[in-house]
Amino acid sequence: MAYRDLRDFITQLEHLGELKRVQAEVSPYLEMTALCDRTLRAGGPALLFENPTGHNTPVLGNLFGTTRRVALGMGVNDVSELRQFGHVLASLKEPEAPKGFKELMGLGSLVKTLWAMAPKELRSAPCQEIIWEGADVDLARLPIQHCWPGDVAPLITWGLVITQGPHKARQNLGIYRQQVLARNKVIMRWLAQRGGALDFKEHAALNPGQPYPVCVALGADPATILGAVTPVPDSLSEYQFAGLLRGSRTELVKALGSELRVPAFAEIVLEGHIYPDATHASGFEHALEGPFGDHTGYYNEQDWFPVFTIDRITQRRDPIYHSTYTGKPPDEPAMLALALNELFVPLLQRQYPEITDFYLPPEGCSYRLAVVQIKKSYPGHARRVMFGIWSFLRQFMYTKFIVVVDDDVNIRDWKDVIWAITTRVDPTRDTLLADSTPIDYLDFASPVSGLGSKMGLDATNKWPGETSREWGRPLTMSADVTARVEQVWQTLGL
């Protein structure tokens, strides 16, 4: 589905019956969360709240509440079609020598297509039609959601954070939640391993005492948002990949107060800086963030993160505020992960051809548990795959549990997976434990914040050398009997 910006996408979703306008008054304080959560769990449409309590700005929620809408946002009709983008990313991440002239020409065509999708910079843009500066900068003027009763403050959730490290040509796009701290201040909760935090760390080391520019785009088009959460190779701009998804170049405009480039058709853009603060060990202003309800289904603990001071807010005329909540799966991040799972399969298969399928069940908080199907070739093969997944992509750095099964097990069917675990696993022999590894800061089960253990389960059939016993043979019915019974079955009317 081709579209230019979020508004165009909304119009097309409504035409497809994938968006519902909510004309009743609904409060950003808790009520939007409750209504979006109920709608998502029912497989319902995106919701456009046209009358948010206390505000004139409509709120868009549940945009990515189904895998189909994620697929539509990436320019295809079905989630199964996303593997084509996975093959593109695999070619770019780990390029191999072409196996022939035809493949060489195909790779050249891919590079040419990506080059043609380089972002286009505009001199002026809709996102700067209205400008708030000075005392006009007040986040209370925006319908920012307060998602859960125990949340300490309203929370910006779908903000596309734009940063750039010193001496880097490429800007980084990331989605990090932001706690509203004051009328013009938010807390930027980016984890140390994320791109925005790394850019900021480099700036702080090379330019101590100098403010660090940041922009946050709210209501960017879906392709740009999804490009920011996709494992794009470091050599490729997320803006460029968004153009590939959208089928047209991403249009950008220079921010008014820095050299950063922002999406030209974003609904709202927050421009500002992280300012120096000699009282903090980092040399920059920090504040205690949280607690907030998170995708784990719990409130997370508090921690210190940088304070982003907003110098100006630019926006389109009659802007739309794009928001979400996170909670016990399923939520929007879980639906995103379920769809993006299809991108990961070709990426992993390029590095590990023995992987025949890969699944991140949403019940596992989107990334904490992975089930891997392999074509086993030798003893210890499952363990090689476990270590490979943990180290190959940054997205799997925080995966706590990996279950590896043979290619006769349907990894998207829990009944089949549990059968494999209970019949093919000896807890002592087939459990791999790794201690003191990077763990999600939000994982309160780990003994130390950000550092914990991982577990791998080898639920494959065991080969000689892995067991001294005769291994069981799965029960199967003969093909001729199955065919005969099928004929009888058709006569029973069952």
Curated annotation (Swiss-Prot):
Keywords: Cell membrane, Decarboxylase, Flavoprotein, FMN, Lyase, Manganese, Membrane, Metal-binding, Ubiquinone biosynthesis. The active site is at D294. It comes from Albidiferax ferrireducens (strain ATCC BAA-621 / DSM 15236 / T118) (Rhodoferax ferrireducens). Its cofactor is prenylated FMN; Mn(2+). Mn(2+) binds at N172, E238. Pfam families: UbiD, UbiD_C, UbiD_N. Catalyzes the decarboxylation of 3-octaprenyl-4-hydroxy benzoate to 2-octaprenylphenol, an intermediate step in ubiquinone biosynthesis. Homohexamer. This is 3-octaprenyl-4-hydroxybenzoate carboxy-lyase. One of its GO terms (cellular component) is plasma membrane. The keyword Cell membrane applies. One of its GO terms (biological process) is ubiquinone biosynthetic process. Pathway: Cofactor biosynthesis; ubiquinone biosynthesis. Belongs to the UbiD family. Its EC number is 4.1.1.98. One of its GO terms (molecular function) is 3-octaprenyl-4-hydroxybenzoate carboxy-lyase activity. InterPro entries: UbiD (IPR002830), UbiD-like_C (IPR049381), UbiD-like_N (IPR049383), UbiD_bacteria (IPR023677), UbiD_Rift_dom (IPR048304). It is a peripheral membrane protein. It catalyses: a 4-hydroxy-3-(all-trans-polyprenyl)benzoate + H(+) = a 2-(all-trans-polyprenyl)phenol + CO2. Binds 1 prenylated FMN per subunit. It comes from the Bacteria. It is found in: Cell membrane. Prenylated FMN binds at I175, Y176, R177, R189, W190, L191, R194, G195.
